[in-house]
């Protein structure tokens, strides 16, 4: 911490203490701070008396002596607390539940039903499958037309070829990937097929921990950071048999698409950024460098880059996926979710990562009833009425029209009038507080 920053911290703490005495307004706090010359440890009864006179107050000698002891003792305590470092992965003692009091939910659980499958065949050139969705890639692996090792090598080759332009990979986990792919092939060969993600190569946003590899949070301040744990989402995808190819780029401290000295690029328009902060997952998935990826979202960090790069991103409801091992930005808004090349891919990945782990107490045990064959007729979809008008992006308008043609019932919605920048400003303060050690 710089000397000026430390001085400002002490000044704020000092003003807080004065406020607790009912002296937080008016001239008194500022006058007393000036009397102390920025060194609250040296405050004396005479300083308080002078400041009180300037502020038009009378404080008795007995009260002044009590204030001297209280101010100095409290400021020393604030300094001691400041030196205690709480690890970023330590959750607060209170946790947020977005459910409205009295609201009830159905606990009916039905089997996960994948959509109708097409008969996929291995192409002559394996790289032709680079952009295939997981629903098709999984059929190639399950039928043993393609091995996980073949698929993994193909994606690794594409990463080496295209990442120098896209800047979407922070750390390549090649050795781990080949080990996991070989294990998947051995299991599948003896009939131990775990499901649609078995043997599928994927990438994870670099705010999510994987033991043995850097977790940089996209910041020079944490460039060599390693965390001795696997995030719950990583552990669950490994249980599903997925193959981790890379730690993918995040904007610095999960903000934007710039990290270190690079900017992650949109594969379809490489002179532009891919959006943030799940910049790497969106870029890599859209460019066919991974089968799918995992991102995080606090204020649009899954949805924004997914739209920019033209892919499917799912920002789950808060409390559906554990954030254990994930860099916190805002404890009541952070969410972890899939970025894929189809909606059903998102459903498949979400099914694998959702649910309680007894490590993130905000996660609820709620069913996820997916039927990939269900008709969309009579499905109610809300749309923000104010977001569509004469200047609306043509693709957004086309999306609404496509939904109507599928039989979806569109219901116009309006956000509360107080929503917007005021709420965002509060969130930005919360985000800054999460990284006060950098101040």
Label each PLM-derived region with a short phrase.
Residues 197-336, 384-386, 421:
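Short glycine/serine-rich loop/turn segments
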Residues 144, 199, 205, 239, ...:
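Glycine-rich, small-residue loops and helix-cap segments
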Residues 154, 183, 232, 236-239, ...:
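Alpha-helical scaffold segments in soluble metabolic enzymes
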Residues 240-242, 342, 407-411:
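A generic structural motif
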Residues 135, 149, 231-235, 343-347, ...:
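A structural signal for well-ordered alpha-helical segments within the folded catalytic domains
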Residues 136-143, 222-225, 334-341:
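Short, well-ordered beta-strand elements within core beta-sheets of diverse protein domains
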Residues 317-368:
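A short core secondary-structure module
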Residues 1-192, 352-439:
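Amidase signature
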């Amino acid at each position: 911490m710089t000397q000026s920053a430390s001085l400002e911290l002490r000044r704020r703490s000092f003003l807080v203490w004065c406020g607790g005495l009912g002296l937080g307004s008016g001239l008194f706090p500022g006058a007393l701070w000036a009397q102390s010359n920025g060194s609250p440890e040296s405050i004396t009864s005479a300083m308080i008396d002078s400041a009180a006179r300037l502020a038009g107050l009378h404080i008795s000698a007995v009260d002044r002596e009590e204030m001297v002891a209280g101010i100095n003792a409290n400021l020393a305590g604030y300094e001691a607390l400041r030196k205690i470092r709480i690890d970023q992965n330590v959750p607060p003692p209170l946790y947020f539940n977005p459910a409205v009091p009295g609201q009830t939910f159905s606990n009916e659980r039905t089997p996960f039903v994948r959509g109708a499958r097409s008969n996929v065949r291995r192409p002559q050139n394996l790289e032709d499958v680079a952009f295939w969705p997981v629903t098709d890639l999984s059929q190639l692996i399950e039928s043993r037309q393609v091995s996980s090792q073949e698929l993994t090598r193909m994606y690794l080759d594409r990463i080496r070829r295209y990442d120098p332009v896209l800047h979407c990979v922070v750390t390549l986990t090649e050795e781990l990937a080949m080990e996991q792919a070989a294990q998947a092939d051995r299991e599948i060969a003896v009939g131990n097929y775990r499901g649609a993600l078995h043997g599928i190569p994927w990438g994870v946003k670099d705010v999510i921990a994987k033991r043995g590899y850097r977790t940089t949070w996209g910041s020079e301040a944490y460039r060599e950071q390693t965390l001795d744990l696997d995030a719950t989402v990583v552990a669950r995808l490994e249980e599903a048999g997925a193959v981790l190819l890379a730690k993918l780029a995040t904007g610095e401290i999960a903000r934007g698409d710039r990290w270190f000295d690079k900017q992650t690029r949109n594969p379809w328009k490489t002179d532009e950024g891919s959006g943030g902060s799940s910049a790497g997952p969106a870029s890599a998935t859209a460019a066919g460098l991974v089968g799918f990826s995992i991102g995080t979202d606090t204020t649009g960090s899954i949805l924004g880059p997914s739209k920019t790069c033209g892919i499917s991103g799912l920002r789950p409801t808060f409390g559906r996926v554990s954030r254990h091992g994930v860099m916190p930005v805002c404890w009541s808004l952070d969410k972890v979710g899939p970025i894929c090349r189809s909606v059903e891919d998102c459903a498949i990945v979400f099914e694998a990562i959702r649910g309680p782990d007894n490590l993130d107490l905000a996660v609820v045990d709620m069913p996820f009833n997916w039927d990939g064959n269900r008709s969309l007729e009579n499905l109610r979809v809300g749309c923000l009425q104010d977001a569509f008008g004469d200047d609306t992006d043509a693709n957004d308008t086309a999306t609404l029209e496509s939904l109507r043609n599928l039989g979806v019932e569109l219901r116009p919605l309006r956000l509360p009038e107080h929503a917007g920048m005021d709420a965002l400003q509060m969130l930005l303060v919360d985000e800054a507080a999460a990284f006060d050690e950098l101040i």
